[in-house]
């Protein structure tokens, strides 16, 4: 059994990936990974994790407060952990909106601190594409700081550092109906002297990428601030069948109550258009001046 710790767990996306596999187009549980505990500070996300994984110990706590003594007080051993997984908050690294080198951008240091006393054989660190392009306080690449911090843990005493391998992966290449790039850092503890090589399932191509239609064409159309609880048809694609599983009732199909201003913006946007197109229409007098967008839209 491989012992795993999930940091910055959110609702449990990474845990799901390690606890499940796909057989005959169905998600089935796998028994070779044991999630010893998960950590999440956001209450709603922690509650969602508890609902999704009731058998996993959830530590709802600021990660800065977690150390060996804290875990021991909770009856949790920090010894003989094989793998740490997690992706620190990504808002600061995101390419959408204003990017700031703030406290959230430095949360990888807490991840590193946890590594120093748990000393897993390996870690998986996931984050957004912006991690590769964001600058630190000295205007250098933040990714260099992150990798170097994992390479050398000598400031924590005798803790062994990690050889770090980096790769940019796009979810659309692996069966997800979303053009979503993510940076993965894999760390192997140096004393193990293991060379890591990236291996993946066969990538999808333009001919077999899963489209938005493939994913949601079985869902009813919603108006503003509306909810519907029935699928409009049987699954039309393998992807829909996989995600639906044995569920017959449609859950959480609810539209937001968008204000009139945002509705006007959405109605004005054509396929592939964004903030610059809206602003151009404002400047050309096609749209009202109050629709001009300053940040947060791409």
Question: Each predicted region: which residue ranges?
Answer:
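Core alpha/beta nucleotide-donor-binding catalytic domains of modification enzymes
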Residues: 2-119, 129-133, 137-143
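Class I S-adenosyl-L-methionine
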Residues: 73-78, 88-296
